[in-house]
């Protein structure tokens, strides 16, 4: 019985291959794909944003309405993403807009209502299309109401008698807090009388609604699961996560090696494998190509890379105070990112002063992001917090040793050289200071300068680490089965 295939509906606000703004989209594609590889029936549900290419041409499999909702009419469209069926919930009132969440850096004022509708429609459609999942897997605040609705409304329907809910926490900073007046669209939001509803006297917090009602909860790394039980790590929801501690686990995200592997990466001028000769030739060629592309002197020098959003979370505020001192060393640094205008202005000032050593590319470019990973000897991720992180995993695959702060998924995936050289895959610091980052960068540079043979050994060892999605998917299956017991 334990080996019976499971049926799963993976509910998310975005999915790579259709529409994407962040890492959630990568998980929404890769995890269902891996579940199908393990012989489970995994289907995806997302809103039918008009920004999705050719969404108007998708097959309509359901034309219906949602009772008690002001804008009741919706359609379910269907397409495939690889072997995964995708259900697209179409409602022009909510999703016929230029982008997913915001315009001109202003969030849509009805985002709470939009994603409440989407959550309700995902459950409402299931009996109508005849798909009876064992598990409904919600993700972040956008679908936090799915476990709430399943428990308090749809749970009374015999169709859902055996269906359990999972909530994945990708980033608890974003909670989906909306005024109660905005959430009157369905009777079930009159939930002041529901003891575990995430409602204050004036507001509903959609992520709390999910946390308090999901059958099981997972964070996207084991360390992040522990951090969520603290005020600092949960950003104000420690009590809720402590209450659900027995149902909270951490599962490290996998890596999509079909998109991120130096042997097959079409963005690279030279592909390379995890052998010393191939790696050295490939990384040297990629370093030269990066130097030429961004206008740095072409020379054999320790290359540091960083690709990130310019935000407090990504730790740019740790780099800036020591950047000038660091650039006095024999190094080059390429930083690619957009975001906070104040951080960007400071980076531009340093780049103007150290043009022979530091280039700041204020734009995201996928080709350049891949090339930086391959060309770098070391990759900077000094994050304030990092639920999982993927660039450190990409870096290891490309033989670029990550320099990380020991938080969240960074702590779970990177082994520090000074702690155990034999199993090291990078460099780790813990103290949240610029000086701690500088010392760690200097440690890395010392290895490059004094023992290049040892550096190559560590790089090869890092390249051989395996963070494939099938491993993570097996852990999710265990979580699903525990919810069904």
UniProtKB/Swiss-Prot annotation:
UniProt-listed SUPFAM superfamilies? UDP-Glycosyltransferase/glycogen phosphorylase
- Pathways per UniProt: Glycan biosynthesis; glycogen biosynthesis
Pfam families assigned to the protein according to its UniProt record, in alphabetical order: Glyco_transf_5 (PF08323), Glycos_transf_1 (PF00534)
| GO CC terms in record | cytosol
Q: Which residues bind ADP-alpha-D-glucose?
A: 20
Select a single GO molecular function from the record's annotations and give it: alpha-1,4-glucan glucosyltransferase (ADP-glucose donor) activity
Q: Name one GO biological process term.
A: glycogen biosynthetic process
List the InterPro entries hit by this protein, alphabetically.
Glyco_trans_1, GS/SS, Starch_synth_cat_dom
What catalytic activity is recorded? Answer: [(1->4)-alpha-D-glucosyl](n) + ADP-alpha-D-glucose = [(1->4)-alpha-D-glucosyl](n+1) + ADP + H(+)
* Keywords of this entry: Glycogen biosynthesis, Glycosyltransferase, Transferase
- EC number(s): the record gives 2.4.1.21
Q: Which family does it belong to?
A: Belongs to the glycosyltransferase 1 family. Bacterial/plant glycogen synthase subfamily.
Its biological function?
A: Synthesizes alpha-1,4-glucan chains using ADP-glucose.
Give the protein's recorded name: Glycogen synthase
- Which species expresses this protein natively? Vibrio vulnificus (strain YJ016)
